Structures are given as structure tokens and as C-alpha cells.
């Protein structure tokens, strides 16, 4: 009797749940990621690398921020340089510039996203300033653990080597904690915090530099050739296998000394085929693992320092190393030396560290041919898909300055069809005094998402058919019927097709519904093209007939 009662309850509950699901329209989705435009999407503007008084005066800057806000920018991101905040000595902090910047942001009624920039400014693409990291830092150790050394022996000091985790734990921890205390009075204007994870603020090795002859579009140079790095790799290998004899068995080698366990002696050959060997797989796992551990460490330090005071998301950046991607001779020959061998595993570290991820090059297109073998769009799609699968909040940037509408449209395609929660425009000077570019940005990317219900009645579907909509803007798939159409769902209660769709408020849109058969072919289109001019700022519904 008890079992019969439980069975009846389960049946009744199932019927009720089914009935409720039919009454409530489901969130519609783009075919690629199952989410459509992110309802939390916001646009950000990247501040100049130099201090504001070196570029303009504070009053003009505040007016610029008001203008940016009117054009759809929610917040301004800004680098606060370690080499400026603690240049005079260990724990001799000066946050006066950060506080003055925050005051101007507050005066303008805007938000800011501070970047705790523990790397140098200067020497990377687009840099127009020169702020090295504090000189006293290099006295913290007497060995070579604090800096990088490449295959060719080039020493790089633009940021601390993540292998120096003891120094990083102390110095970054102190910096983060002091920053939180100094900026507490301005917590209301801080929307998010970004952490520098390496060169140019990106979680990577300094594997492509002009000083090392590895600028774009060359292959990268590995950066594990200090004596400290060699010893760390050796220790990792011996811990994994237990003895030199077991190492030789696994690698198929005949090493006669533990000292012979070394990084690749020939980076070119390694990238051609050495990476396929067990030795190569181990080396790349260790090499990327250093970045993963660094991600977890700075995430831990940041959450400990910032969560209580600011209670905002914290993020870090992965670089868009898009060249040599599909080189048939050295595939991914720029990514591997940067520390990017397994993006899925790297993103797991972001997830573990509770960090949002920012990725670059949203404005670029694939070329995939000699000599660049550049595939930025494919790379963006791969990273975005992985981040969405793992539930990691995803933000984007352009890699180079944008100078035309077409590049904005490419950004919109990626941002609105791959669930980006935000896009940061690089950089302030490019749009602030260019009304044409600012207007294009506002229309295409400076948008406010709003959930609207789309209803289509009298659709002549048969069993196995599905109804989609597509339209004239990136948020609607730009008339695409394969990758980006937004799926509607059949409502048996109302006998129509409907769904909740995130749309750009106060923008004019045009769209049509169409039917796809079970095999994916387009059967027919809605007769009359629909217009919504403009999309309301408040949630409502749009109903049309087939």
C-alpha cells in the first residue's frame, strides 16, 4: 500500500511539473552554447596606460567618463602599477593615484575595475609607458629563481617567475591587502578586480618578445632555463616516477644522471615532434602546471584580501596567442612556449581559484596560412566553449586597436553568441575623441540586455520540426540559420512557439521565424519580417503570426 501511495505521488508530481513547464516559456538559446546573449553583459573601457595627468586633466577626464557612460560603457578598467604603488621599498605603499582615480570615477557617476598590475609597463604591443616592477624585489633572493631565462639565454624581468611562489605569496599578499585597506572608502565604485598573472597582465610566460627574436608571428621560446627552473622540473619528474631508472623506462631514454633531466635542448625540434613523446608530454604538463599553480595562488591571495571589503568578482586574463596555430610543421608553436598546451586543464585552475576569465582577440578573423597560420576566431570559439561548459564567467577584449565598424561586428558576433558577460574596449583614446567610432560602438556593443518573450502563432510544424528565429543583429544571429539561430519551444497550452530571448534594449531589430526539420534543413520561413522599433527597456512580449 505504501509503495502504491509513493508511486501515485510520483506520477502526480510529474504531471504537475510537466504542466508548469508548458505554461512557462523557456529561455531560448543560440545553437552554439545553449545560452544566447548573456543577460549580464556589460561594456567596459580600458583607461590609458599612463597616469591621467600625463594624458589630460582630471576635470576633462571626468567629462570623458560621463560621455563614455552615455554611450553604453558601464565601467573603466585601469592598471595600477606595482612599480608605482610600492616603488620606494618593501611595504612602503603609495595608493594616492589609485584613490584620486577612484574619486574621479565617483564624481562622474561611473564604475571602475582596478587591475593589480604586478608586471612592468613597457616592451609589449601597444605599451606607451615605462614602469618596471619595484627594483628592490630582485634582492629578495640570491639565486636565479625570480626571473625567466629563455632557450637562447635571454633574461626577462618584466614580472616575477611564478616558480618563485614563496616571494609571490608574501609580496602579492601584502600588496593586495594594503590595496584593499586603501581603497575601502571607494568600494562602491569598484565593480570587479582583475589580477595580473604575468607579462602584459596575462597568465603566460614571456615567450614572445622582440629582445628574444620571437615577436609576431614567430614561434615562441620556452622560458624554463634558469638553474632554479631546471631543478624544479627535475624534482617534479623524479617525484612522478620515483627514480632515474623509472624515468628512463617511461621516456625510452638512457640518462646516466639525474642532472640530465632537463628542459628541451632544441625548442624547434621539440615543437616539431618532441612534444609527442612521453618526455614531451611530461615537460608540457609541468610547464603549464606552473601557470595553473600560480593561478590558484593569486586567486587565493586575492579572495583573502578583497572579498570581505569589496564583495565583487575577481578575474584574470589568458592571452590570445593565435599565430602558428595550424602550422603543419610546428602546430601551436607559439602557444606551447607561452604555457598553453591544454586549455581545458588551464581553465580548471580558474574554476578552482574562483576567477573569471578574460580572453582577447575577439575582433580578429582566421587566416590560417603561411607565414602567420593565424586562427584567432577559432581560438576564441574554443576557449569560450570550454569556459561555458565549465561554468566560468567569460569576458572579452580586442587585441589591437579597432578602427572600423566591421571589427565591432566581429566582436559582437563572438560576444553575443558565446555567452560573454562583458567586453572591454582597448583603448580609451581610440573612441573618446572619435564620434563616429563611439557611435558605432554604442549601437553595436554599448547595449543593455533585456529579457523579452517572443511568441509565434499558427506555425505549420509537423512531428520532428523545430522553430527558430534569426535577425539583423549579432544578438539575433545576423540572419544565420546554422550556428547562431535562437531556438523557440512549443507551448502546448497556448498552441504556439515561444521563448525568452535576451535582446538589446532601445535598439531597432528585425527578425523572422523559420522551421527546421529533424534533419536540420530549413523547411520554410515566416511570411512577414518582424520589426521591433525599438526593443523596450522593460520586459514584455512580441507576438506575431506565421
UniProtKB/Swiss-Prot annotation:
Changing residue 194 to Q: Reduces activity by 80%. Its EC number is 3.2.1.2. One of its GO terms (biological process) is polysaccharide catabolic process. One of its GO terms (molecular function) is metal ion binding. Residues 1-30 form the signal peptide. The active site is at residues 202, 397. Keywords: Calcium, Carbohydrate metabolism, Disulfide bond, Glycosidase, Hydrolase, Metal-binding, Polysaccharide degradation, Signal. Disulfide bonds join 121-129. It is an enzyme of class 3 (hydrolase). Binds 1 Ca(2+) ion per subunit. Pfam families: CBM_20, Glyco_hydro_14. Residues 444-546 form the CBM20 domain. Substrate binds at residues 79, 119, 127, 317, 322, 360, 398-399, 427. Its cofactor is Ca(2+). Ca(2+) binds at residues 86, 90-91, 171, 174. It catalyses: Hydrolysis of (1->4)-alpha-D-glucosidic linkages in polysaccharides so as to remove successive maltose units from the non-reducing ends of the chains. InterPro entries: CBM20 (IPR002044), CBM20_beta_amylase (IPR034835), Glyco_hydro_14 (IPR001554), Glyco_hydro_14_CS (IPR018238), Glyco_hydro_14A_bac (IPR000125), Glycoside_hydrolase_SF (IPR017853), Ig-like_fold (IPR013783). Monomer. Belongs to the glycosyl hydrolase 14 family. This is Beta-amylase. It comes from Bacillus cereus.
Amino acid at each position: 500500500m505504501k509503495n502504491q501511495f509513493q508511486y501515485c505521488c510520483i506520477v502526480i508530481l510529474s504531471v504537475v511539473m510537466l504542466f508548469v513547464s508548458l505554461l512557462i516559456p523557456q529561455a531560448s538559446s543560440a545553437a552554439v552554447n545553449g545560452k544566447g546573449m548573456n543577460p549580464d553583459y556589460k561594456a567596459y573601457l580600458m583607461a590609458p596606460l599612463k597616469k591621467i595627468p600625463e594624458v589630460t586633466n582630471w576635470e576633462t577626464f571626468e567629462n570623458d567618463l560621463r560621455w563614455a557612460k552615455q554611450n553604453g560603457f558601464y565601467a573603466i578598467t585601469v592598471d595600477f602599477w606595482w612599480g608605482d604603488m610600492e616603488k620606494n621599498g618593501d611595504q612602503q605603499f603609495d595608493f594616492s593615484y589609485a584613490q584620486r582615480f577612484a574619486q574621479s570615477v565617483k564624481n562622474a557617476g561611473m564604475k571602475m575595475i582596478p587591475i593589480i598590475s604586478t608586471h612592468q609597463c613597457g616592451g609589449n604591443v601597444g605599451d606607451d609607458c615605462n614602469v618596471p616592477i619595484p627594483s628592490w624585489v630582485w634582492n629578495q633572493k640570491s639565486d636565479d629563481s625570480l626571473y625567466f631565462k629563455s632557450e637562447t639565454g635571454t633574461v626577462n624581468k618584466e614580472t616575477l617567475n611564478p616558480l618563485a611562489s614563496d616571494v609571490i605569496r608574501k609580496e602579492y599578499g601584502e600588496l593586495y591587502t594594503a590595496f584593499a585597506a586603501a581603497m575601502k572608502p571607494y568600494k562602491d565604485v569598484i565593480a570587479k578586480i582583475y589580477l595580473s598573472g604575468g607579462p602584459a597582465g596575462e597568465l603566460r610566460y614571456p615567450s614572445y618578445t622582440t629582445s628574444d627574436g620571437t615577436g609576431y608571428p614567430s614561434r615562441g621560446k620556452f622560458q624554463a632555463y634558469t638553474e632554479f627552473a631546471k631543478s624544479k622540473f627535475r624534482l617534479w619528474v623524479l617525484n612522478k616516477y620515483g627514480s632515474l631508472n623509472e624515468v628512463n623506462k617511461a621516456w625510452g631514454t638512457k640518462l646516466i644522471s639525474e642532472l640530465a633531466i632537463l628542459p628541451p635542448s632544441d625548442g624547434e625540434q621539440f615543437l616539431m615532434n618532441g612534444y609527442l613523446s612521453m618526455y614531451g608530454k611530461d615537460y608540457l604538463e609541468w610547464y603549464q602546471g606552473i601557470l595553473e599553480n600560480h593561478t590558484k595562488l593569486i586567486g587565493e591571495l586575492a579572495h583573502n584580501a578583497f572579498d570581505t571589503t569589496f564583495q565583487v568578482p575577481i578575474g584574470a586574463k589568458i592571452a590570445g596567442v593565435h599565430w602558428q596555430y595550424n602550422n603543419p610543421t610546428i602546430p601551436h608553436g607559439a602557444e606551447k612556449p607561452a604555457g598553453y598546451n591544454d586549455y581545458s586543464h588551464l581553465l580548471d585552475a580558474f574554476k578552482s581559484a574562483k576567477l573569471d576569465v578574460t580572453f582577447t582577440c575577439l575582433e580578429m578573423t582566421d587566416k590560417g596560412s603561411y607565414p602567420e597560420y593565424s586562427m584567432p576566431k577559432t581560438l576564441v570559439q574554443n576557449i569560450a566553449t570550454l569556459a561555458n561548459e565549465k561554468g566560468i564567467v567569460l569576458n572579452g577584449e580586442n587585441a589591437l586597436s579597432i578602427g572600423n565598424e566591421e571589427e565591432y561586428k566581429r566582436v559582437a558576433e563572438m560576444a553575443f553568441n558565446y555567452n560573454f558577460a562583458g567586453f572591454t574596449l582597448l583603448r580609451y583614446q581610440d573612441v573618446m575623441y572619435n564620434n563616429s567610432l563611439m557611435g558605432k560602438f554604442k549601437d553595436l556593443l554599448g547595449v543593455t540586455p533585456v529579457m523579452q518573450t517572443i511568441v509565434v502563432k499558427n506555425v505549420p510544424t509537423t512531428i520532428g520540426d523545430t522553430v527558430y528565429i534569426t535577425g539583423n543583429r549579432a544578438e539575433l544571429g545576423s540572419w544565420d540559420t546554422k550556428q547562431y539561430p535562437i531556438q523557440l519551444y512549443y507551448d502546448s497550452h497556448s498552441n504556439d512557439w515561444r521563448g525568452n530571448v535576451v535582446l538589446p534594449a532601445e535598439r531597432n531589430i528585425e527578425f523572422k521565424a523559420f522551421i527546421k526539420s529533424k534533419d536540420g534543413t530549413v523547411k520554410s520561413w515566416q511570411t512577414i519580417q518582424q520589426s521591433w522599433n525599438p526593443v523596450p527597456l522593460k520586459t514584455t512580449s512580441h507576438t506575431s503570426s506565421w
